[in-house]
């Protein structure tokens, strides 16, 4: 709803959601830079959290489906308008799942030490049982049902075809398409485009409190910690506050029930064909990765593991693995700790089916926290829209699909703020008011 008086919008979070929100606010037909003032508070740096360390996968088969088609198309539109192919690596990719059952003979005798077996047992959890691999929530049941058995593509030559028992391709063009962006490049480029239209990004500025009026019905100001000076500061007279703080959203708005889940990833230096590959790898019990064996440790996981690998432009391959629920969310993104051994596990598991990646240097080992909207222990969809407090908007809880669904989220939030409702998609199922958020 475009107001006749100066309108101040504050967004908490300089990741993909905060950046796309700022971008689409400045592109809305009602935006007037002389009366509309937009400030983005970021506790660390732009794309310093999951938005800079995610896989960047885009898929028409992603979830929630009320959001996905709009956002997938917006990615194509943004790439066409702003040269996304060059600026952030936008491209279509093949996508499928490989299934491999490995025997000791496949691993022994390899010159790579990480394939040697020393017969150690598996690490036991506290209950005495071997640890099972926990799958990332990337594919829901509907997406898994779209996989179709097919031949291993001839250009998917960075996977050892002799070990692959089954390959399932992700569906048909126009319905289950898959694309990708480089998440850090995309997020920082979108933030820069917003900044060029007048958005003010305050970095190292951690939002700590959203202040309401005396009746607790409307936003009035935002308090934040200027980490450079260690001084508390305020943005006064705000008319709208967008909480797009990823896993930290729940700390600003506890009723949102948004929390963080740590996940690790590695980046290989490898020039490989453009595929996103999901895996299901059965490992022989006696095999132990080299880094574990060298430390006299046991293998962490029992039989099956299913890491994911995405080829990227610029001679990169990105791999991610299971989430780690034991690590508490730190205060800011630059304080996230990476467990290097988990990254080494991930690289070792992928190396069992990809000699190319086994031989490739690893340029980064990293961790981030996925934002999850949780209710009674169950993961729900993201929260997008108005809350019970006038002027307070939620845009958080996107789990694995923040990069994919960021553009739609930003566009819809801009419609909420300027027009009072979402116009480009029906996202009633993501309504924060269903959960009385804001109270």
State where each predicted segment sits.
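Core beta-strand elements of the Rossmann-like FAD/NAD(P) dinucleotide-binding domain
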Residues: 5, 229-240
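N-terminal Rossmann-like FAD-binding beta1-loop-alpha1 element of flavoenzymes
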Residues: 5-39
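Conserved Rossmann-like nucleotide-cofactor binding loop
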Residues: 17, 46, 248
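Active-site substrate-recognition segment that forms the wall
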Residues: 23-27, 56-58, 88-91, 239-390
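Conserved FAD-binding subdomain of flavin-dependent enzymes
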Residues: 24, 36-37, 43-117
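Short beta-strand to alpha-helix junction loop
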Residues: 66-70, 173-193, 335-342, 400, ...
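Flavin (FAD/FMN) cofactor-binding and adjacent substrate-gating region
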Residues: 81-82, 90-91, 97-203, 209-217, ...
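C-terminal catalytic lobe of FAD-dependent flavoproteins
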Residues: 349-439
């Amino acid at each position: 709803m475009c107001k006749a008086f100066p309108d101040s919008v504050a967004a908490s979070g300089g990741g993909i959601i905060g950046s796309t929100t700022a971008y689409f606010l400045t592109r809305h037909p009602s935006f007037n830079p002389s009366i509309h003032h937009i400030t983005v508070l970021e506790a660390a740096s732009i794309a310093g959290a999951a938005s800079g360390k995610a896989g960047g996968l885009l898929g028409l088969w992603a979830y929630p489906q009320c959001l996905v088609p709009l956002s997938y198309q917006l990615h194509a539109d943004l790439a066409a308008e702003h040269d996304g192919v060059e600026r952030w690596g936008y491209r279509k990719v093949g996508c499928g799942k490989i299934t491999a059952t490995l025997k000791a003979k496949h691993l022994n005798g390899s010159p790579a030490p990480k394939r040697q077996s020393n017969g150690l047992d598996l690490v036991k959890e506290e209950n005495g049982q071997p640890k099972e691999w926990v799958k990332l929530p990337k594919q829901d049941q509907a997406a898994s049902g779209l996989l179709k058995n097919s031949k291993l593509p001839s250009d998917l030559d960075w996977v050892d075809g002799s070990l692959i028992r089954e390959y399932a391709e992700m569906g048909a063009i126009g319905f289950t398409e898959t694309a990708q962006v480089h998440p850090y490049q995309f997020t920082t480029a979108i933030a820069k485009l917003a900044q060029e239209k007048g958005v003010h990004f305050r970095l190292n500025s951690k939002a700590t409190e959203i202040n309401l009026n005396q009746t607790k019905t409307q936003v009035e100001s935002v308090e934040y910690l200027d980490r450079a000076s260690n001084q508390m500061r305020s943005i006064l007279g705000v008319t709208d506050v967008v909480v797009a703080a990823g896993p930290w959203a729940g700390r600003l708005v506890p009723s949102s029930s948004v929390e963080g889940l740590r996940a690790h990833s590695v980046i290989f230096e490898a020039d490989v064909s453009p595929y996103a590959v999901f895996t299901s790898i059965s490992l022989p019990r006696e095999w132990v990765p080299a880094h574990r064996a060298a430390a006299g440790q046991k293998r962490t996981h029992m039989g099956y593991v299913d890491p994911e690998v995405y080829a990227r432009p610029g001679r990169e391959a990105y791999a991610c693995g299971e989430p780690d629920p034991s690590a508490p969310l730190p205060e800011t993104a630059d304080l996230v700790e990476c467990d290097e051994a988990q990254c080494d596990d991930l690289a070792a598991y992928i190396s069992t089916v990809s000699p190319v990646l086994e031989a490739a240097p690893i340029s980064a080992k990293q961790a981030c926290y996925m934002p999850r909207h949780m209710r009674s222990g169950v993961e729900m969809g993201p929260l997008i829209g108005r809350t019970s407090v006038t002027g307070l908007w939620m845009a958080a809880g996107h789990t694995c699909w923040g990069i994919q669904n960021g553009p739609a989220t930003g566009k819809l939030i801009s419609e909420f703020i300027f027009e009072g409702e979402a116009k480009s998609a029906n996202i009633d199922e993501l309504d924060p008011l269903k959960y009385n958020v804001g109270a």
